[in-house]
Structures are given as structure tokens and as C-alpha cells.
A protein has these predicted regions:
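Basic, Lys/Arg-enriched alpha-helical interface segments
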Residues: 1-64, 73-77, 86-105
Length: 105
């Protein structure tokens, strides 16, 4: 898989040094495995993955952070969308598609 916006991801986690090693592990998982489906990612990532309105949300470092990406398994591309703390993540109404799209861009 190829990650689009890796530079933006690294910028987003800069204020959170405690998350950096977890992000590096996540990146190695997607880089080293040419996965084509979400089940592979779930199996390799302790099943701490959710899908909401086309976004894939990974729990990072337990439940302290959320890494939000869009995955196109056909083209094998992952697009970084947002990196949120648990507090930021909890403020979003995940049942409201319009709010999710607005908050995540």
C-alpha cells in the first residue's frame, strides 16, 4: 500500500511524541504488506479499526488517538485525512454524515 500525505501525517503527530512509535508501527504494517482488503489490516492491527462514511479509523496507542484515513484497496492507496486525540474524536457526532464530512474535510 502507498500512503499519500505521509508528510502531513508526520506533521500532525509532531505535537504528540508519545504516539510516534505507534504511528511508525502502523506505517510499517501498511508499507510492508501489499494489503488489498480491510480484513488484512484489521488482523494485523488488533481489530481496532472502524469504518464510517468511507473513512477508516484506527485506534492508536490504545484509545488515546485516532488516525483517520481513506483506503482505496483497488489502487492500493491510503490517503491520510486526520489525526485526532480521543477528546477531539469524541466531539464529533459520528452518526451525522454532514458533520463527519465537515470535520474531516
Amino acid at each position: 500500500m502507498r500512503l499519500i500525505s505521509k508528510k502531513n501525517l508526520l506533521s500532525a503527530i509532531e505535537p504528540y511524541p508519545d504516539a510516534q512509535s505507534a504511528i511508525e508501527s502502523w506505517y510499517q504494517l501498511i508499507k510492508d504488506n501489499d494489503c488489498q482488503w480491510l480484513e488484512f489490516v484489521r488482523n494485523g492491527y488488533s481489530r481496532s479499526v472502524e469504518q464510517v462514511y468511507g473513512y477508516t479509523i484506527f485506534n492508536i496507542k490504545g484509545n488515546q488517538y485516532r488516525l483517520i484515513v481513506q483506503i482505496n484497496s483497488r489502487t492500493r492507496i491510503i490517503i491520510f485525512t486526520k489525526f485526532l486525540t480521543e477528546a477531539e474524536y469524541s466531539k464529533i457526532n459520528w452518526n451525522d454524515r454532514d458533520e463527519v464530512k465537515q470535520k474531516l474535510g
